[in-house]
């Protein structure tokens, strides 16, 4: 089965921080992954 949204969020941050570099990396990854998480949850509610 798919991981929980929280698990997917953590995995997103890990992948993002591997791909990104720099001081802003952690905050930018957090914003990107939170946005993605909200969009996924929003779609699930609409379905």
Swiss-Prot record:
It is an enzyme of class 3 (hydrolase). The keyword rRNA-binding does not apply. Homotetramer. Inhibits protein synthesis in animal cells. This is Ribosome-inactivating protein luffin P1. Keywords: Disulfide bond, Glycosidase, Hydrolase, Plant defense, Protein synthesis inhibitor, Toxin. GO terms for biological process: defense response; negative regulation of translation. The keyword Hydrolase applies. It comes from Luffa aegyptiaca (Sponge gourd). It catalyses: Endohydrolysis of the N-glycosidic bond at one specific adenosine on the 28S rRNA. Disulfide bonds join 12-33, 16-29. The record marks 2-3, 45-46 as: Cleavage. Its EC number is 3.2.2.22. GO terms for molecular function: rRNA N-glycosylase activity; toxin activity.
């Amino acid at each position: 089965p798919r991981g929980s949204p929280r698990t997917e969020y953590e995995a997103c941050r890990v992948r993002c921080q591997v791909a990104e570099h720099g001081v802003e990396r952690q905050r930018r990854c957090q914003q990107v992954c939170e946005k993605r998480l909200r969009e996924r949850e929003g779609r699930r509610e609409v379905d």
